């Protein structure tokens, strides 16, 4: 297990994120962790009116580890993890700059604090 990777995400942050994913089994059908901080999630889609459908969809999520995520970091994440559609900040109190948010939007990505990510996961509005 690593202490830190190229993006400065500590093992404790990675482990906590995996625990969050594991505690949401009705929403996270499965996940695979690659490249240390890239997570390939299979998430349950919203069920139909009768709740009979059991479909899922996939999304790639990159985990950020700094207190403030900048535009340069978003560009770096995009270069390193081009399949990632979401960058999750590993702490609820962590921030991202408005420039980072604009850069992510231009790249077709979303920046989310951990609580925003879990809320989107719970409401099944992640993808």
Report the location of each language-model feature.
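Hydrophobic, Leu/Ile/Phe/Ala-enriched alpha-helical segments that form helix-helix packing faces
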Residues: 17-21, 77-78, 104
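Short, well-ordered alpha-helical microsegments
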Residues: 70-72, 96-101
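Acidic-basic catalytic patches of nuclease active cores, encompassing PD-(D/E)XK
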Residues: 1-47
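Charged, structured surface patches that assemble and position nucleic-acid processing machinery
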Residues: 101, 105-127
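Acidic beta-strand-to-loop metal/phosphate-binding motif
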Residues: 84-92
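Conserved catalytic cores of phosphodiester-cleaving nucleases, focusing on short active-site segments
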Residues: 39-78, 84
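Short, low-complexity, polar/charged sequence segments that are solvent-exposed and flexible
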Residues: 79-83, 105-108
